[in-house]
Amino acid sequence: VKIDKKARSILNSFPKDVQDYFQEISEKCKKHQFKFRVSSGSKVYSGSGSCGGFFSDSHKELAIAINSPLKWVVAILVHEDSHFDQWINRQSVWHNPKVSRNITYFFDWLSKTKNIKNPTESVKHVISLESDCERRSIKKIKKRWSHIISPENYAQSANAYMFSYLYMAHSRKWISDRINIYSKCFYRNFPQKILSKFEDLSEKYFELFCKYDKNARAAPNRAALRPINRSL
């Protein structure tokens, strides 16, 4: 584990079961020859921006920032651990060539280095990867972490996260950091169960994102770095 003195102090203040989970992730990373980086800040630099945590198979690293409310530290660690599980399972959506290709297309388009005919269709492949991750995560939370974060709140923030990609497909820019999917005043607008489909951005949700979006570029709160080094 790569962890500084301040981060170690923060980690030691966490409940024992959470500390044990960090140790489990450390051992999992060691087994698969990944680095596990624990930051004392509220965000960690992913190489393409700052975020709460990320999993990168190209850099072989899982990283998380822990100077945040405990429930969201646990939520982000569970999310990145679920991306790790996707990577381990060679049959998962993580290894689907069509999904990877469209993820590349979408983020190249978002960064304005490539034009594509239908960004909404490409972004649905991003969402397919993330929604699979979120369903894995909600199972872990219900089984083990519901005393720290309510599954309903997690599902609401996960739904907000998925819809944020549909919004970005309309705006062609990263969402503003004013759009905080971990803020109750924002995530309370979304369903308490993870939706089965994310086909369209309703007018209601579009207006909600517009209300909070101030056109500032910001990396997403969660990240999973694909081999192409894009943040998801």
What is the role of each PLM region?
Residues P15-V18, K28-V73, D81-I88, W94:
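Active-site scaffold of zinc-dependent metalloenzymes
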Residues W87-S128:
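Post-HEXXH active-site segment of zinc metalloproteases
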Residues E80, S92, K98-S100, H170, ...:
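Generic preference for flexible, low-structure residues
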